[in-house]
């Protein structure tokens, strides 16, 4: 019987931690200044050093969506969700981007996942209800 092996987690040096934190702060501040392209660039630096940094993936996705780069945003949300599947806001924001792409069925599925994790998520509830209410009568088109 083969034994399943797992890849050991990378242990970061203090210097690497400092670099990740520096790049993350720069990215976050660029986002606050609405310099989304610059923010994405710095989130890429974070991800290059720490590929499991789910908050960097999530923030990068959000900033890509603000740049109307929806496909790239969805891909980043997918990574963030894979790394941290219990945060309902990840599913909600992915659903919102899918709405912008007129992918209503997929958006509702994301809102449903979000509501499984957090039944009180107002944003997911509101947009899910809005989509369901307007499906079929072309109010979104």
PLM region spans:
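Alpha-helical segment of the N-proximal tetratricopeptide repeat
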Residues: 17-49, 66
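Conserved structural position within tetratricopeptide repeats
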Residues: 47-48, 79-82, 115-116
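Helix-start (N-cap) detector for alpha-helical repeat units in TPR-like alpha-solenoids
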Residues: 20, 54-55, 88-89, 122-123
């Amino acid at each position: 019987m083969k034994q399943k092996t797992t890849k050991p987690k990378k242990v970061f040096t203090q210097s690497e931690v400092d670099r990740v934190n520096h790049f993350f702060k720069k990215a976050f501040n660029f986002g606050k200044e609405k310099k989304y392209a610059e923010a994405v660039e710095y989130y890429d630096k974070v991800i290059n050093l720490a590929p499991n940094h789910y908050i960097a993936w999530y923030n990068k996705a959000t900033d890509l969506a603000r740049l109307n780069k929806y496909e790239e945003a969805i891909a980043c949300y997918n990574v963030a969700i894979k790394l941290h599947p219990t945060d309902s806001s990840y599913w909600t924001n992915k659903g919102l981007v899918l709405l912008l792409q007129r992918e209503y069925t997929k958006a509702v599925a994301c809102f449903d996942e979000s509501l499984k994790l957090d039944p009180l998520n107002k944003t997911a509830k509101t947009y899910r209800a809005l989509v369901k209410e307007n499906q079929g009568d072309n109010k979104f088109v």
